[in-house]
Amino acid sequence: MTRHTPSRTRETIEQLLSAIESRDLRAVERYLHPDVVWQNVPHPPTLGRQAVTELLANVLCWSDQVRWDILSSAASGETGWYERVDRFWMAGEEHAVHCNGVFEVDAGTQMVRSVRDYVDLGEWRSRIEPVMTQLASRPASEVVARHLDAVRRCDPVAMAADYGLHAVLQRPGRAYAGWAAIADYFDTVPTRLGDAEVLFEHIEPLGEDQARVAWRIAAPGGASHSGIDTFSVLAGRITHQLTELHSEDF
């Protein structure tokens, strides 16, 4: 049986922590074992890669920045102990929580198979839940505005951040189903845009749970593309986007 050296154990754990800081759920999943168990002790554990990703996505996707500062660490065999301050910036404010985590690594897959985090979850929830409630109750126009700002910055992870895990982005001839597929699509946008600029019209609210925005891509040399995006939003996350083109796709 292959066993991890302490340095390899640290490397695997810290790759997961870096993925969490990136807010890219695809990277997070890359370092989670399919049968991973994540427990915020003494609360019941979350079982399996998909469920753990959903647990983390609740706060990662609404964070503009994430930083998990390591205060101290130790490793032995396939186990690592990490004292941290987990820091999240949401809605313009920083929210931090002290954690002591015990991480276990699967040597065969080089993935994290178990996390036991010791944290005052009650105190953390008392501070974070009002923020999460406010973000979940935003009208569609506010959610879409945050997404459009990410498009202007050409930040693919931020572009995907406001989509639900099971959202669908529907463009002419193709639909992208699920957060990872949508993020993969947004990864291609900066290269495809090149030096072109996306110009958005005013966001048109269609009730509390839908919004529509017309856009135009102005490319050097006079070429242009245009269309309309209609967004459906539930609990602060985009669940469906329909893109209608007025010309060829960019």
Predicted ranges, named:
Residues 7, 18, 25-78, 156-209:
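A solvent-exposed, acidic/Ser-Thr-rich amphipathic alpha-helical stretch
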